[in-house]
Amino acid sequence: MKKIIIVGGGLAGSLTAIYLARRGHDVHVFEKRGDPFLVHSDYIDKVSLRAIGVSMTIRGIKAVLNAGIPKEELDLCGLPISGMSFYVGGKFRTRDLSPLESLSPLSLSRSDFQQLLNKYAVKNKVHYHYGQRCLDVDLDNKSLIVKNNEGEITEHKADLLIGADGVHSCVRQAMQHDCRRFEYQQFFFKHGYKTLVIADASEVMLRKDLIYFFGMDSGGLFAGRAATIPDGSTSFAVCLPYQGDISLQTRNALTMKKFFDQYYSMLPETTRAQLLSQFLDKPSNDLINVRSSCYHYKQHALILGDAAHATAPFLGQGMNMALEDAYLLDTLFDKFKNDIGQLLPEFTRIRKAEADAMQDMAIANYDVLSSSNPVFFMRAKYTRYMSKKFPANYPPDMAEKLYFTSMAYSELRDIQKKQNVWYKLGRVN
């Protein structure tokens, strides 16, 4: 049995902890936020401000179920997703997706899902240390220094350190300093976002089984998303630039009222008023893309989830890939018979290529959703028609594969590229 310290007790960190604890390891999770089971903890408050309604696709579901979490309990955290709808020119264009497996994607309550993971982590004897902010990581000594809410500073050592501490990862920063030829790339998207919540979804009059997208008729001004979760609330993510007459910095109520009246005209006036009030009151959040050339350091440390490969949420795969990271790590323990020296480099080799592919697709999707693209729907319709008419020759529907399978991201990116070629040929013909 090894002592393993995981920095970060979010979704990726908690699922990883479950997998490792099931193998008999002594797992300790250090989390800067409070206990998610405490209603008034800072964890819940911060998540409610930043979470863009989380969509769990089949790859994420399989990663959770393989950790021994019952499907019926996971289902209680979300609502089944059967398709997506785009609001353009005052009308909805709805696309139902055809299930390819017995499982269905879920629109999750992030806080409920976090509590579910913590529940099973504790059942598997994972030790959580809340209110512990990581100050420094010593990779060669496999130790970290943390500071609790009372200001007490302590040092903790382990046999393996895992960084699941998000986009501003302490563990990754230590790797940047200590890893020879470590390459790190970061850029901010021109848009940030605010999360607005309507407590009673019945007011909104949107289908609970659809994910909604807004802004494709805005000429690149903004991109929006909406989804309903089991508690009956609907979460709206409004992504806008940081500068301009209409932006995340706009404080003119009349200007933003016109914005919501134009692009959310299908909502009741009282609902639009609630969105406006929240928009003017809530802080904005950044969208950032992170690429790391290596995910491990010697036999001492590993990074996964957003710490390794954060990106914009416009493909809906950030959380799903993070959960799949935990599952892959578990399979590598079997493949290499617990040999850390072999499995950590293999994790980097496999996951780096897949993360790059996922990020490439997310960035491409962001460009489509945040820019004026009048041929988007024509192209989507053409793709579905061709894949059904000529299944042996034309690439399959990428959206259905993305939501309903665990197909490798690198394969999905190849499908996307082939569809681009076929579409160009179709236009020429």
Task: Label each residue range with its predicted role.
Residues K2, T270-A273, T331-N429:
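C-terminal helical "tail/cap" subdomain of flavin- and related membrane-associated enzymes
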Residues N141-S284, R291, H296:
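Conserved FAD-binding catalytic core of PHBH/FMO-like flavoproteins
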Residues A21, T57-V197:
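Conserved N-terminal helical subregion
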Residues M1-I4, R22-R23:
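Extreme N-terminal leader/targeting segments of oxidoreductases
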Residues A12, T16, D35, H168:
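Conserved Rossmann-like nucleotide-cofactor binding loop
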Residues G9-I18, R22, G163, L196, ...:
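Conserved mid-domain beta->alpha element of the FAD-binding
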Residues A21-L49:
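Glycine-rich FAD pyrophosphate-binding loop
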